[in-house]
Curated annotation (Swiss-Prot):
Organism of derivation: Geobacter sulfurreducens (strain ATCC 51573 / DSM 12127 / PCA)
One Pfam family of this chain: Ribosomal_L14
Name of the molecule in the record: Large ribosomal subunit protein uL14
One Gene Ontology term, aspect cellular component: cytosolic large ribosomal subunit
Gene that this sequence comes from: rplN
PANTHER family: 50S/60S RIBOSOMAL PROTEIN L14/L23, LARGE RIBOSOMAL SUBUNIT PROTEIN UL14M
Oligomer and partners: Part of the 50S ribosomal subunit. Forms a cluster with proteins L3 and L19. In the 70S ribosome, L14 and L19 interact and together make contacts with the 16S rRNA in bridges B5 and B8.
UniProtKB keywords: Ribonucleoprotein, Ribosomal protein, RNA-binding, rRNA-binding
GO MF, any single term: structural constituent of ribosome
SUPFAM superfamilies with a match to the protein in the record: Ribosomal protein L14
InterPro entries: Ribosomal_uL14, Ribosomal_uL14_bac-type, Ribosomal_uL14_sf
Disulphide bonds in the chain: none
This protein's record includes keyword Oxidoreductase: no
GO BP: translation
Amino acid sequence: MIQMQTVLDVADNSGAKKLFCIKVLGGSKRKYAGVGDIVVCSVREAVPNAKVKKGDVVKVVIVRTAKEIGRPDGSYIRFDDNSGVVINNQREPVGTRIFGPVARELRAQKFMKIISLAPEVL
């Protein structure tokens, strides 16, 4: 469960390391974002000579949350961290690699490029 002012880790090689959530997209009164949702973030930490710089405002899709996700079969899945992947306006990842597992719920949101780049889909 991601809300405004949440600090996110980055699960790709776009160059950002830490992100600060500015806004949850999807309506003026929307407070929380889960896996597969898009948030607007600012880059708090970045590596030198990267595609994104510190202070850039980027769109991010959430791929892992520490809050458990309920599945239709009654099972739950949760991760150790809150992580996202930096995307462009065409909903494609800026980076070329994805680190760590991603949730299967991304498939329903049509993030197929992220699913195919991920080493593991849980």
